[in-house]
């Protein structure tokens, strides 16, 4: 996987990135349910005739308004149906990559026949929870995912318990790669990025390959709110300058347009989110291209961006009322600042300004409008970098920003983890009332 002679801390960083930066086809909350349904279907004796599902309020929030790839339909029911009838149980976040036209037609027919139900799990203390139960006559199979989009904790059929995570705890005593992030700092991450052998991090270039393809697809103007394509048209009309700033916003938002609009191309995700992966990748790629960076320099900038985004998001709930495109863009700000300047002071100032700028943006569920939040976050990240290059930043005398960037991050994450939980409940209540 990588050179075993590396600094042990660096090995943990690389493992953390490999754990959190993965290809994902479709918005990851509906995909989590699709995966549960696909695994359940693989355990079922006979073809699926009916699907029942239960999800946490947060997963419901992020599944109500987003298009499931290849279907032209939004919502969790089609995700559950297609996962059960056409999903690849071994493909993780790419569970729907092999879904055929026939499987899509069958899933839609199952929906039309009223054979698919998705409800909120009550009570539910988990932020990320999905359970799918598939039926063939009186025979059934049920799969439960908790805590992570692909973290299967229980598989059961009508006649046996196939798997339960608790029974495997003794075998898995090795701590999570993410645990190291609670004991590290941005300064240590920067040292790693500057000194790690290129060969050990070359894999991160795959994020540029996948997300650039998604961005190019988004520029066709067929997906979502087509923000990227619209802004590109305004450049051609002379209403918007065609420069580095606009290119960052256009190419980043275009990838999100395609992602949320249901394009059948994978995104390279970050922290379980395609939009976070797009945000952490595309801005950095555009700046790297502008300065003619080679593959090694791009890889180091992308590693700084993705690892910083993971480091910040690791202090947050997996899903919350805080739009995590903002925290991914803080990683992007670090990556862009490194490309232009390379100094820790510039990077920390850029992140502090981001916290002083977009930290209040709410997550009101996954939808086409996520691309607007992605574009706003990307724009704010570049603005923060430009300010930092001029030795200007939001200071510790203002708002929740502290004099130390680590404390600023902790302050932001404390808000999202505690006070904003009531905001999250209110958002879910509003969205649920609209769906009635």
Swiss-Prot record:
One of its GO terms (molecular function) is L-cysteine desulfhydrase activity. GO terms for biological process: L-cysteine catabolic process to pyruvate. Transmembrane segments: none annotated. It comes from the Bacteria. InterPro entries: Ser_deHydtase-like_asu (IPR005130), UPF0597 (IPR021144). HAMAP family: UPF0597 (MF_01845). Belongs to the UPF0597 family. This is UPF0597 protein YhaM. It comes from Shigella boydii serotype 18 (strain CDC 3083-94 / BS512). The lineage of its organism: Bacteria, Pseudomonadati, Pseudomonadota, Gammaproteobacteria, Enterobacterales. The gene is yhaM.
